[in-house]
Amino acid sequence: MDKIFVDEAVNELHTIQDMLRWTVSRFNAANIFYGHGTDNPWDEAVQLVFPSLFLPLDIPEDIRSSRLTSSERHRIVERVIRRVNERIPVAYLTNKAWFCGMEYYVDERVLVPRSPIGELIENRFDGLIHHQPNHILDMCTGSGCIAIACAYAFPDAEVDAVDISNDVLAVTEHNIQQHGMEHQVTPIRSDLFRDLPPIKYDLIVTNPPYVDAEDMADLPQEFRFEPELGLAAGSDGLKLARRILACAPDFLQDDGVLICEVGNSMVHLMDQYPDVPFTWLEFEKGGDGVFMLTKQQLIDCAAHFSMYRD
């Protein structure tokens, strides 16, 4: 970004609204990629500017006319420069992301929350489960946002948050503590189901790595800051999904269900397993690539995935 723009912003912009407008203009001029919780320059600017001022996203309109100190202007401008020049996702600049309307800590150890599964949680999996779940598993938990959101949605349920990485689980545990959910959400290190105790869950929710090799090669620069461990899943993006499909029925109650996100790799899944009765879920807020299977359906199609059992 040209120095003249930086100097003008620091010296001539005075209010929160000024800084929001300037940030949107810089984002538009830079043609950055959106996809880490926002899809437009205004929301991206809000998620950068307000947290940089230690303000909530829903501040009253009249507060936006408040004047900024020099240090506040410098802090915002510095982050805008890094977002534009280095293409770092806003969430990694502020260490804040939102999921199901709640704030989470994130850094480069975990993916930025953005799963459409959040809509299912907000609707309490209406039409997908037939009773209040007592035990929920969030497989490949990352920041822990799905597990914690499920705990809010079902306050009487016990939720296990599983990931293979200790670094990831450190972030998970931080968010569990920030939300005061230590009594309800348990972080567990496991390579998928391999190291889990023999628990039967009413609901397994999973957003595993699912980006195929072709998409990995074409990812916008912003996604290069996210951990490859949380994205890449082999040539067809199904490396982990197959293992989950193979092992999930052993960990489900008789009336339990599996909900799994595979994103763009849904094409590979449908092509390779046309006989599996995936229910592909629809979302009012956008998103796709999420399927549901019951335990019985998983048992019925077990032969397709038996070679991938742990």
Curated annotation (Swiss-Prot):
Keyword set, alphabetical order: Methyltransferase, S-adenosyl-L-methionine, Transferase
Reaction(s) this enzyme catalyzes, per UniProt: L-glutaminyl-[ribosomal protein uL3] + S-adenosyl-L-methionine = N(5)-methyl-L-glutaminyl-[ribosomal protein uL3] + S-adenosyl-L-homocysteine + H(+)
One cellular component term from this protein's GO annotations in UniProt: cytosol
GO molecular function: nucleic acid binding; protein-glutamine N-methyltransferase activity
GO biological process: methylation
Pfam families (UniProt xref): MTS
EC number(s) given by UniProt: 2.1.1.298
Family listed: Belongs to the protein N5-glutamine methyltransferase family. PrmB subfamily.
Name of the featured protein: Ribosomal protein uL3 glutamine methyltransferase
Organism for this UniProt entry: Yersinia pestis
